[in-house]
Amino acid sequence: MGTYPAFSGSLQLPEQRLHGTSNLHPAGGYRIELQVQDATFDKYPAKQHAQRVAAKLKKEKGLIFLMGQKAALLEDSDQETRFRQRRYFFYMSGVNEADCDLTYDIQSDKLTLYVPNFDLRREIWMGPTLGPEEALKRFDIDEAKYQSFLEGDIKQWASCSGHGSTIYILHGSQKPTGDFPNVLMDSETLKPAMNACRVVKDEHEIELMRHANRVSSAAHIAVLQGIRKMTNEAQIEGSFLNTCVSLGAHNQAYGIIAASGANAATLHYSKNNEPLKGRQFVCLDAGAEWDCYASDVTRTFPTAARWPGTEAEQIYALVQNMQESCILRIKEGVRYLDLHYLAHDILIHGFLAIGIFKAGRAEEIKKSGASSLFFPHGLGHHIGLEVHDVSPDSLFAQDNDRTTDSWLFSSTYLSPCTASSPTLKSGMVVTVEPGIYFSQIALDNAKSEQLKHIDMDVVKRYMAVGGVRIEDDILVTKDGFENLTLAPKGQAMLDYIQQGNGSCNI
């Protein structure tokens, strides 16, 4: 059992969050109230995860060994690096503490955690470290021991298991310490099996991701409520971090992107230090982490409670249409790459309507790759213990004889937005994050077959928009989806900017 800052208060959500079939825009908007208070959470289901991995391995015997992240010092310094637990280790332990290892004996179904040996000096300076007795109370394990027992326990297991027994490890560099001459070290089999398990989330994992999204959505709302008084991108980043930390989320799932104006056309902009004056839009891509689980949320908004111009409003509406059209089609069995193609189709028809693309056949424009100049990334990716979470391709990818539209596809796209990815499965969590970007460097390096479809005189009117991206985290269900992300969009977003005091209580 653990004590964490927990969700509390009232929450008004769009109906689609629960059912995935209704209006994406609740008439009353969104209301999130979060506060820090003590609450008891169930144990992370580490033992169930170990059993799932063993079943995926399809082995009756063997020992799984996973090495946790070690505490380390910065180079030429006595200061420790920021600790980040190895995600595969966390998946089978639920332990977010340094210097731990674990074993899982497949045959006996025994999960053992090894914690750091008692160190009096460290206890005095840094406080109590995790001991065996506490570990047994807090975590879903069968046994807890000090690290000093690990080598002897593995040797005893090897002796009982016989010559040629196998220890399954993630990497050759993560072998258990010691000499085990009659044991095979298999570093090829475990990772694909764990990936196949990690990509489909259980209810405990989903609830952690719901809470990460609650915190992130509250932080996005706090930015909206304060944006009219902000003058620099750094203040946006600071506001977001302040809300997250105040609500108990001390880690971000990735580096915050607070990009205003033309900076929003840089997909992974990170400087976050330019003035907002004269900029039409801010693209804020930021997501908190909760108990090692990520959220990934992007909102694009003006610095005032109104659209900065016709062009900005048109592009925002087009991206919102791209996103919502794709989200509404999500359910088990859908091929995600088809949603990526749908987003491009909507972009192309939208650009034809506003004149960015010259009159012509949409299919010809599509084949030229012209739309990829403005939407150069994949529609989304898996999310979980990593913001760009693992892919299941290696174990249950399916043959797909459908032609890949190479003009809309890049080898840099992440699963499930790849040709080899399996169809969506209930329990997967994916992002849906279409965007439209007016990048001068992309246009300057465009191919002639792309440029012939683009009216550059019209494009000039839209360059000041910079970039618009909207991103939500979507849980796939049997019959539809659940949108885990609660931050407002569109008119509801403008209303929060106008209110400036709102109802996101911290």
From Swiss-Prot:
Detail which positions bind Mn(2+) 2. Answer: 285, 296, 471
What does the cofactor field's note say? Binds 2 manganese ions per subunit.
Output one GO BP term.
proteolysis
Query: Which cofactor is recorded for it?
Result: Mn(2+)
Catalytic reactions of this protein? Release of any N-terminal amino acid, including proline, that is linked to proline, even from a dipeptide or tripeptide
Q: What domain of life?
A: Eukaryota
User: InterPro entries given for it?
Assistant: Aminopep_P_N (IPR007865), Creatin/AminoP/Spt16_N (IPR029149), Creatinase/aminopeptidase-like (IPR036005), Pept_M24 (IPR000994), Peptidase_M24B_aminopep-P_CS (IPR001131), X-Pro_dipept-like (IPR052433)
Q: Where does Mn(2+) 1 bind?
A: 296, 433, 471
Q: Membrane spanning segments where?
A: none
Report the GO molecular function annotations.
Answer: manganese ion binding; metalloaminopeptidase activity
Instruction: Tell me which EC number(s) this protein carries.
Output: 3.4.11.9
CDD domains linked to this entry: Prolidase (cd01087)
Q: Which family does it belong to?
A: Belongs to the peptidase M24B family.
What is the documented function of this protein? Catalyzes the removal of a penultimate prolyl residue from the N-termini of peptides.
Q: What is this protein called?
A: Probable Xaa-Pro aminopeptidase PAAG_05466
Natural source organism: Paracoccidioides lutzii (strain ATCC MYA-826 / Pb01)
Q: What is the lineage of its organism?
A: Eukaryota, Fungi, Dikarya, Ascomycota, Pezizomycotina
